[in-house]
Amino acid sequence: MAVQQKIRIKLKSYDHSLVDKWAEKIIEAVKQTDAIISGPIPLPTESQVFTVNRSPHVDKKSREQFMVASHKRLIEIINPSSKTIDLLMKLELPSGVDVEIKS
């Protein structure tokens, strides 16, 4: 039984529509090279809540909360060819999307 080579692409952004859009673009590009694709798999959303005082001097009980959510997607490419890897290197992603590639 041959060992299958995998590439895992993890996309992360604060805007879920941006992550979904670029996940679809990556999948469309990889499908042109006839590689097997698994995904996009939605990973759990991480949320951070920041609590700050509304007033700089008094009223400790008056506070405001802000929340930041980071959305993640996972794409697996099974048995990629050299053409697939070249295509992934040439993709230009927007500045709002963080990409992590592992083999």
UniProtKB/Swiss-Prot annotation:
The keyword Transport does not apply. GO terms for cellular component: ribonucleoprotein complex; ribosome. Keywords: Ribonucleoprotein, Ribosomal protein. Pfam families: Ribosomal_S10 (PF00338). GO terms for biological process: translation. SMART domains: Ribosomal_S10. Disulfide bonds: none annotated. InterPro entries: Ribosomal_uS10, Ribosomal_uS10_CS, Ribosomal_uS10_dom, Ribosomal_uS10_dom_sf. GO terms for molecular function: structural constituent of ribosome; tRNA binding. Belongs to the universal ribosomal protein uS10 family. HAMAP family: Ribosomal_uS10 (MF_00508). Involved in the binding of tRNA to the ribosomes. Part of the 30S ribosomal subunit. This is Small ribosomal subunit protein uS10. It comes from Chloroherpeton thalassium (strain ATCC 35110 / GB-78). The gene is rpsJ.
